[in-house]
Amino acid sequence: YGKGATDRAYIVAQKPAVALDASDKDYLAAKFFDVTEVMLKRFPAYAALKAKPRNTYTTQDWRDLQVWFNLAWLDPDVLAQEPFREMVKRGRGFSENDKARVLNQHLAMLKEIVPLHRRLQEKGLIEVSTTPYFHPILPLIHDSDSAREAMPGASLPLARFQQPDDARRHVQMATEYYKELFGRAPRGMWPGEGSVGQAVAPIFKEERITWIASDEEVLANSVGSTLRQGEKLSRPDLLYRPYQVKDGPAIFFRDRRLSDDIGFQYSKMSGKAAAADLLAKLKQAWTAAPANDSRLVTLILDGENAWENYPDDGKEFFHALYKGLTTSSWVKTVTPSAYLAGQKPTPLPHLWAGSWIGADFSTWIGEGEENRAWDLLEGARTALDRYRMRHGMNAKYEKAHRILMAAEGSDWFWWYGKDQNSGRDEEFDEAFRGLLKEAYALMGETPPQVLDVPIVQVAIAVDQTPKALLTPPLDGKLGEAWEAAGRIAATGGAMAQGKRVFEDLRYGWDDTAVYLAFAYTKQPVPMEL
C-alpha cells in the first residue's frame, strides 16, 4: 500500500458514492461492517447505519459507510485528533473530501510502519522477528507425515507432500525481504502458528536464524513432562528458560496462560485492573524462583487480533502495564537476542512436531476437506517438477513456483474442515483453487477439471419447505401456483455475487412429478439440449 498498491476494498472505498454500481454496493454491504461489536458500540452512528435496511440507503448513506469503515479502524489516538474527532462527533453527512482525509491518513500510517520499527530496533528498544514467507506450516511442507508424531491415528492425504526445498525457500525469502526492509538479517523467526519440529530445526540454523519460538505444550511433549497441574504452572523451572535444539537454533516457549489472558481475558476488564493482574502473576513467578535464578517469562500472542476487543484498543492496559514494568525493580524487559547474549540455553535433544494450537497440526491437516486440498496441491507441485525436468527453471517455472508456494500458506488449510469457519469459506476455497489453476496455465497445461469442483462442502439451507402439493403450469412464470413451493436461496460470498445466475430455486411435487423453477437474476440464454 505504501508503494501505491491497491485492493478491491480500497478501490471501492475511494470510488465516489454517486458512481457506485450494484456490485460495489453488494461488496460494501458484505465487507464494510467487518468490525467487532466492541468497536461498533463506540460509534452509534455507524451502528445505526448497520441497522438501517439496505434497500433504503441513499447515496449519502453509502458514502457514510465508505467513511465509517475506514474511520472505525483508525487508532483511538488518531481519532482524538482533528479533523477525525469532529467527524466521529458528526457521525453522518460525510463528504468526498472527508473520505479522502481518512483514506490518506491510512496511507500515511502504512508508510510509517517499517521506518518506525526500524528506528526502534536500531535504538535497541525492540527486536523485530519475521516468519517463513507465505506463512506455511513449515513441518507439513517439509513432510506432511510429520503430523503423525502428534496424530498417529490421523487420516492423512492420499499423496504424501514432501517439499523440503520449498520449506527452506520460505525461510530464505523471509530473510531476504527482511534485509530489504531493515538493512540487516533477522536473528529471530516466529514459525507460522508456532509450528516447529526436529526435522525443520536445521533449516533455521543453516539459514542463520538464531532463535525461534513456540508454545509450552510443544515443550511439554518435547521433554516428556507435564508443566501444569490444572491451570497452575507446576514446572516453571522447565518453562521459564530458553533451549538449544539439537542441530537447530535456540527456542523460547510461551507461557500459554499469561499470553491467553492478554489475548482473550483482559479485554473484559478495565485496563488498569488487567495490567495489575498480569504484574501480580509475574511477581508471583519471581518470588517463587530460587535466589539468583534468572527466569525468563515469554509472552506470545496474535498481535493483531486482541486489541479490537478492548474498549479503547488496549490503550489503558498498555499504559498501565508499561508503567508497572518500568518502575518495578524485580522485573526487566529484554529482547530474545539480548537474553541469549548473556544466558546459555538448555540443550533440547528432540523438538516435538507441533504448533501452538494443541501441540499438533490438526487445524491444517487430517479432515476430509483439508486432505483434499493437500492432494490437489501435491498434484500441482508434481506437475511443476515435471515441467522443470522438460524446460528447466525458466521464467514461467519461477512464476508458477512462487504461486504454488503461496498456495502452501497455512491460511488456506485453516479454513478447510469443520474446526474453523470464516463465514466466507467458499471465497477462500475459490481463491486457493484459482492459484493452482494459474500455476497449471503457466506450465502450459489444462488445469484438471477437479479444480472446478469446490472443496468446501456447504450445507444447503432451506429457506422454505413446501407447504402443499402443487401442479404449476410450465409457462416460465413464477405465479401463484408456486407460492406453496419450497425455496432455497442462492448462496455465495461477495466474490460470487457478480457471477450469480439465479436468485433462488423453487421446488415442489404432486402425485406424478417433481417441479423445479429457477428465479434468474437476468434473462438466461436458452440452452441447447
Could you describe each region identified by the protein language model?
Residues 1-86, 228-465:
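Active-site and substrate-binding clefts of carbohydrate-active enzymes
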